[in-house]
Swiss-Prot record:
Domain of life: Bacteria
Entries under InterPro entries matching the protein: Nucleotide-diphossugar_trans
Identification of the protein by name: Uncharacterized protein MG116 homolog
Biological source species: Mycoplasma pneumoniae (strain ATCC 29342 / M129 / Subtype 1) (Mycoplasmoides pneumoniae)
Amino acid sequence: MQRTLNVGVILCESFISNAQNPVNSYIKIYENVRMFEFAIKLLQESRINFQKILLYVLEEQIPLVEKVVAKYENCWVFRSKHNEVEDIYEAKGFIEDKYKIGLKSSKNQASSYYDNCCFVVLEACRPLTSKKVVKNVYEKAMIDGAAVAVLPFERQLVCGDNTKAVRQLKDKGNMNYWRQSSTWELQFPQAYTLNKLNQYHKNLFMKARNMLDLMNISAKNPLSIVDGSAYSFRVVTSLDFEILLGILRNG
């Protein structure tokens, strides 16, 4: 029987480039829109029936994200007041107030915050920042026992000097990823192009969906799944997921 949750929340990190190679705001928006759409498809394809999917976005992302949301049913955009999308407190308060989640059990209300909310956090596989952000989101969400699935969106991105980055792509025979790219995408190889996204989309999507399928949403058996590709984070649960993390880390 399909599990039903009231709200699925997607928190998508803003892209953070290194100081030597700043990326303009348009590329940040472009990347996050691609990630949001990936997450929406992921939730809708999972075995869990989400009555609502809430996208937590920045002010500057709304015009483009709303176009994505219009293509899917039961999706809403929540406007963030802060610059950091991983500020889960704001999203949590909004959800608790709007959907009356986290209140005492009754016939018309949720039995617990955990039973009704799944946080899906997408990150761009940045080893230097991922562990801190994931730990922060995980601990804050688990205050109310929410389920957290942390999914990688892409392989490690090329960063650093633009000339060096493009040369690395050519050396590895990967320049075909960028053949249809516009000039600004070539200047900033961190941005995901449609070609590169499609190259790994199918396998990554199936892997992420399988991770969600393994989630046992139950107040008696709280369980969170964390991808271990860039870090190792111990999950306290009745089921030992260290084996799963090892498989994910080692392919």
